């Protein structure tokens, strides 16, 4: 079972995005065939909070669209509490809207990408080098396709960081 705890630190009603995340992440959860329950939190944040989190914990000054903080657990810890706590994901709808316009994506694809991308980071996947990037982005594409979403990355992260 997948349990998602939601928090909303914005002035926007996020109920439709919660339903969307539930659908997408349930498919992602089933894709991995976990033999234990998973719990994670998603907090919707505004630009200011997204930038503060990114500055404080990542030492980057740009406004992030998604930031993830995984929790590492041993098999014994998972068995002891009966589920695996994945960690916390912070999603910035305002930045997602800007990126959807900038890269000509529809907002559902952009948000679907952010939910899956953040989920994979919580599972320990990363894109710090080309080999890891290929693994993570291939998984991301497969899960998005299972959700009937297509997301084409039209920039590389270094270019994005330099422009912000």
Curated annotation (Swiss-Prot):
Pfam families attached to this UniProt entry: YbeY
PROSITE patterns for the chain: UPF0054 (PS01306)
List of residues binding Zn(2+): 117, 121, 127
Broadest EC class assigned to this enzyme: hydrolase
EC assignment: 3.1.-.-
Keywords assigned by UniProt, alphabetized: Cytoplasm, Endonuclease, Hydrolase, Metal-binding, Nuclease, Ribosome biogenesis, rRNA processing, Zinc
Cystine connections: none
Keyword presence, Flavoprotein: no
Cofactors required: Zn(2+)
GO cellular component terms, A-Z: cytoplasm
Comment on bound cofactor: Binds 1 zinc ion.
Record bears the keyword Lipid metabolism: no
Superkingdom: Bacteria
GO MF annotation, one: metalloendopeptidase activity
GO biological process: rRNA processing
Annotated localization: Cytoplasm
UniProt xrefs under SUPFAM superfamilies: Metalloproteases ('zincins'), catalytic domain
Main location: cytoplasm
The family this protein is said to belong to: Belongs to the endoribonuclease YbeY family.
Function, as annotated: Single strand-specific metallo-endoribonuclease involved in late-stage 70S ribosome quality control and in maturation of the 3' terminus of the 16S rRNA.
Record protein name field: Endoribonuclease YbeY
Lineage per the UniProt record: Bacteria, Bacillati, Mycoplasmatota, Mollicutes, Mycoplasmataceae
